[in-house]
Swiss-Prot record:
Residues 1138-1382 form the Rap-GAP domain. Keywords: GTPase activation, Phosphoprotein. Pfam families: RALGAPB_N. This is Ral GTPase-activating protein subunit beta. Gene3D superfamilies: Rap/Ran-GAP. It comes from Rattus norvegicus (Rat). Non-catalytic subunit of the heterodimeric RalGAP1 and RalGAP2 complexes which act as GTPase activators for the Ras-like small GTPases RALA and RALB.
Amino acid sequence: MYSEWRSLHLVIQNDQGHTSVLHSYPESVGREVANAVVRPLGQALGHSPVSASQSLLYTDKDVKWTMEVICYGLTLPLDGETVKYCVDVYTDWIMALVLPKDSIPLPVIKEPNLYIQSILKHLQNLFVPRQEQGSSQIRLCLQVLRAIQKLARESSIMARETWEVLLLFLLQINDILLAPPTVQGGIAENLAEKLIGVLFEVWLLACTRCFPTPPYWKTAKEMVANWRHHPAVVEQWSKVICALTSRLLRFTYGPSFPPFKVPDEDANLIPPEMDNECIAQTWFRFLHMLSNPVDLSNPAVISSTPKFQEQFLNVSGMPQELSQYPCLKHLPQIFFRAMRGISCLVDAFLGISRPRSDSAPPTPVNRLSMPQSAAVNTTPPHNRRHRAVTVNKATMKTSTVTTAHTSKVQHQASSTSPLSSPNQTSSEPRPLPAPRRPKVNSILNLFGSWLFDAAFVHCKLHNGINRDSSMTASFIQILLSYKSSIATQASMEFRRKGSQMSTDTMVSNPVFDASEFPDNYEAGRAEACGTLCRIFCSKKTGEEILPAYLSSVILNSPPLFCCDLKGIDVVVPYFISALETILPDRELSKFKSYVNPTELRRSSINILLSLLPLPHHFGTVRSEVVLEGKFSNDDSSSYDKPITFLSLKLRLVNILIGALQTETDPNNTQMILGAMLNIVQDSALLEALGCQMEMGGGENNLKSHSRTNSGISSASGGSTEPTTPDSERPAQALLRDYGSTDSAAGLLIRSIHLVTQRLNSQWRQDMSISLAALELLSGLAKVKVMVDLGDRKRAISSVCSYIVYQCSRPAPLHSRDLHSMIVAAFQCLCVWLTEHPDMLDEKDCLKEVLEIVELGISGSKSKNSEQEVKYKGDKEPNPASMRVKDAAEATLTCIMQLLGAFPSPSGPASPCSLVNETTLIKYSRLPTINKHSFRYFVLDNSVILAMLEQPLGNEQNDFFPSVTVLVRGMSGRLAWAQQLCLLPRGAKANQKLFVPEPRPVPKNDVGFKYSVKHRPFPEEVDKIPFVKADLSIPDLHEIVTEELEERHEKLRSGMAQQIAYEMHLEQQSEGELQKRSFPDPVTDCKPPPPAQEFQTARLFLSHFGFLSLEALKEPANSRLPPHLIALDSTIPGFFDDIGYLDLLPCRPFDTVFIFYMKPGQKTNQEILKNVESSRNVQPHFLEFLLSLGWSVDVGRHPGWTGHVSTSWSINSCDDGEGSEQDEVTSSEDVGASIFNGQKKVLYYADALTEIAFVVPSPVESLTDSLESNISDQDSDSNMDLMPGILKQPPLTLELVPNHTDSLNSSQRLSPSSRMKKLPQGRPVPPLGPETRVSVVWVERYDDIENFPLSDLMTEISTGVETTANSSTSLRSTTLEKEVPVIFIHPLNTGLFRIKIQGATGKFNMVIPLVDGMIVSRRALGFLVRQTVINICRRKRLESDSYSPPHVRRKQKITDIVNKYRNKQLEPEFYTALFQEVGLKNCSS
């Protein structure tokens, strides 16, 4: 204000008017001269005060010489009468300007202004502190001050020069006494009130008669800033400024404005003749004369004045501590008095017509001389009971030495009802500010900077935002400090203990650092907070608050609704109105000159995140306090109707959607996306619980309210005209068609539309937003709400289009980050397909998805719109990257193997078959089966087939060829039990499969049998005549001789015997034939019996076409093995590697460690012990645990358990002993510690991931852990196929094993003993890199900083870290930073506040949970689980060393093929197929 004017400091310093010529002489000379000269003058005044004769001095020369002597006399010690005579003479002479007397020299009477100017300069010497005789000096100083006071009041001929000298004189004597540090009982302490009172009174008189020039105002302001460590300075300033304000309001706002009543004593300080213009000018200058009153809260600023710096070094040259200055201990009280004075001014401008009983400017209090109980009332404004009062102050009486200055406040009743505190129980109505009060902006322009900064005193920001020095303090810190000052009957504490307040009332405040916060400044801060609250609550309807203030409130208020402030929900509608002004506005042009628009939008979004759960949580609860319109004196009754929280839902949804449409900042956009999943899931769960009926009841109010209350902004200065389509506010104009988004289905559909539209337009270039949008779509796919097929198809099609665009980008733009976006899109596609498998029933959707898979694997589509179909064999594979190809292959596997098949009958814990070679051997009833009975083949270098040809002897039909095949591929281990079926199922039950059809019974009656002798030739032969030729052949008897006759006879006899024998046999045969049945089983034709022994492995391979010659040949120009190869299982280590392959999971696995932290806890042991009993934790914590997953038994669980030593076990003991033991121990209250991973864990799994939730707790003894380890090893004794090293005993450094008694208590109670179940240094499959997430339930939000994450690192071991290749020391230093932590703080409202640490990295924040978000009880478990899934997926995308599960399995299969391939020639291979296996090893 006076920056261009010079100060008068140099003029004062160079002025030598207070020196005398006698100062040049020795001290003895000056003393003697002064005593001799002054005594006659003083005695003349003392002996004849009434009839005083003429003065002894007649000429100007005499007077000037005498004044030189008196000037020196004023510097003498007070042990004599000389100084008193000097004071008497000068106080008599200065009355020449009031009423000339004979005792006054004639030259003085003739030129009083000239002489009195010199006298005033000489009187400065009196006020120089003496070492002794303090009471005498005080009496003399008061005499001079009274004379000065009378001079200023009664003189009418004082010239301007004299006024200026008088003002400088008063400034100098005040500076002499008040600028140095106050000495207890010193002259400054006793004269401070009178000194500053006379200065201000004379200054006001000067303003009336001779208005001071700007240099005087500037000098006064600079000097007053050096005296502020005196309570009287602030007290007198408060008196004067209140008196001036009372006069100012009287003519500024007219007689109808409520008068600001001040005590008559204070009102008399203002000269009656002071005109209105002078009052206005004087008021503004006096307002700033105290400089910034917030400096009173900073001892370093107050002690930086020159006088303090002079005394900062003591005589020995050693610096003193600031705490050694007792006067600085008064600063909290002085600060409070300054804020009280400003509070009174604000009340006056607001038109609160009656001052509060404790708001009048109080008198100074000497804390050193008064008892503590007499301390002033420092009740914060929030807790005051305001009564109608008129403040009258008793006259101040001043003592000489030890008189304490007190004041008496008399209260008089009034007929009106004044301002009451919000928590009062009386029926007094809340006072209304005056209708003609000034605007909020005007009041804030005057006092806002001071009040904001005062409310910000000793506050420490924890949100990392640097506040510009020109910005006002944050409204959230104001309200928080206000809350900390009024909590727990703080008013009674203030009344009893003054401004001292226990820090316990602010322990729960996250903004303040209790170790640095001086509790005795709370009174002043609370006064400023209350004043600001009254200012903002007095805003008129339709009044526009300047963007500078509105943006400051919003920018600094994100945690406002997260801190359990009582009654804070009353302001929810007004914050919603402010958000409706900011978030749908894309440019924010009117705020740009005050704040960063991006930061303003971010703060607004944070507030929105904290408001979204309120409508669902409070539902139809009505707000009984409706502030809007109450202070405007409007006749409109629309604001008087209580509104329900549920009616605010549509407004919040509209703001959310509008913010998404206008947001451009990536971080802000991700926060909005997280909020969308929050509101959609919460709505879905609420409707699923049957609450949609209640929601429907408030639907009419909801829609009508959104049109009335949203149409006019109470915070943005919008038009007060009725809402019309042309004059709608920006939010409604932008969101006019979103009326159906209040239901879960409507929210889901609109979210899908908005996100998919922007995913393929604005967001596809931004990786962070793209990942967040894909995570949102994945979360929306899991929301259990029925929506149309077209909307779901839109989401899938959008993701496919996104992948096409990213893959088609030019090669120079391809990078790892781009490929990470494509991989994330494939993962999102898998989520949608697994959650909605019926989508692939649509031909178009199936075609689009398979084309995208083809694009990812091969790099191009076979069919494009502009090209002919290009077949796979003709295409050259050129995927975007191997990561993209792997993701596409995983999607194809998901489509072919998981869709519609998850969860399997074996449960969601494992998508694989819970069968391996050991299981088949264990449950087979054939003693000849062992592990060598399996044939092992590999198909296409990617699938291992383990074939068991022998039937299992169970329900399989032994009459048919059967083969049991264990298929180990990239997607896991699957068991197929197959039989060769040639007949229908019904024919299998018929045992006459190979019996021919029955024949008819033959007829034995064959008719008559005739004996007919058959001729060799027909009879006609005998009738043919012979010819000569016939006679040429003689007859037999003609040529037979005797010898021949004998032979002939012999032959005839033999023939006869033969004929007889044959006839006998024929008869015998006919007899036997007649005795036989028909048909004859000997001769009957029958089918061959079925085969009983089969080489089913050869049949299986042959039937599937794997035994062709081409399949056994080495591919030309390739290092790949043939399509079919055999493995040699007799090579040592084969079954270890097979078990090693089975340990590789077939889907990602994550681990979450959950801790419970009670107030004040800092050590890991305290935190771990909390979960040992359900009585130690809040009931909502146990409910939260059960919402994360279901309980599983670690010993029988085939999935991930949180530690590699107990995970993926399929051959554990399955008898009833464990369950019986659990039943016995279940009666004990073990709380959440039952899920510590030793016996049980909480588990969640879907088709694409599995999560183990472990609640670490102290372990009773290491012996129990070792015993459980031994029992686990016994139960797994049949796991022949697990790696051999798994069956080794734990490696320790103990010389004598199994001696655990020597362990100290810390080792026996170490919760990390479960780590010792896994032998140190054991090689395990490359399961990493892993991401371990910690979830911490904190009862007190302040304890987040004390969470000992580094100490708990040993408790969150999963065994996977042993597979890391990096050194242990390196991992120990970086591991803590790699662990994301989700803090959950339960609020008193039943909602939950979220704090996330360590979840940001290369890919920025992870949704849906966002730092600062408020979550409902229903959606907490789902959102935490979804956030964990997204965090771990992000970490895997970020890791360079991560490989998908199917890739790791494929690599291991390739390794097994290379190590155990049976390199046989084709003949040898075929020969081996016909050989039996396993028989030779039956005994092994």
